[in-house]
């Protein structure tokens, strides 16, 4: 029912086969049936961010434009109002059939899977941390086998 999270390799460091973990959680909480249905209805070329931490936990943000801005400024497409978020913090850009997150020179940085990045192509289940907010990235392929 769900696609596995791609493994780093075919075997573990101790020689055991790598396991395939289906995407059924958003980091801090399991996906709800409503989350799964929303992801399954995504149009081609779009993606969904589900907030798992911060004042907007549980909120969903549709990435359906070529560029979606994130920040504390009221003009941001995704407004995350907190002092840990820069006014212009990050940008999600559609590049072909994928999305890439770019840090906009923010003070506290943008993190993907707990690694600070200047830019990073996103995959299903990636966790993006902007300030104290955590957003998990999904495309339709996350729930469609």
Task: List where the protein language model places each region.
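Residue-level signal for short segments within beta-strands and strand-turn junctions
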Residues: 51-53, 94, 139
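Intrinsically disordered, low-complexity acidic Ser/Thr-rich regulatory segments
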Residues: 1-80, 143-145
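Forkhead-associated
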Residues: 57-134
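Short, Lys/Arg- and Gly-enriched loop/turn segments at beta-strand edges
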Residues: 135-143
């Amino acid at each position: 029912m769900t696609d596995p999270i791609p493994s780093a390799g075919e075997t573990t460091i101790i020689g055991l086969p790598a396991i395939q973990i289906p995407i059924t959680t958003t980091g801090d909480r399991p996906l709800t049936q409503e989350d799964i249905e929303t992801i399954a209805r995504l149009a081609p070329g779009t993606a969904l961010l589900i907030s798992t931490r911060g004042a907007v936990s549980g909120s969903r943000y549709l990435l359906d434009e070529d560029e979606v801005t994130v920040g504390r400024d009221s003009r941001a497409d995704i407004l995350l109002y907190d002092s840990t978020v820069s006014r212009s913090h990050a940008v999600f850009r559609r590049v072909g059939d994928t999305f890439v997150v770019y840090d906009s020179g923010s003070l506290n940085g943008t993190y993907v899977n707990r690694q600070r990045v200047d830019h990073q192509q996103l995959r299903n289940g990636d966790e993006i941390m902007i300030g104290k907010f955590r957003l998990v990235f999904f495309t339709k392929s996350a729930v469609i086998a």
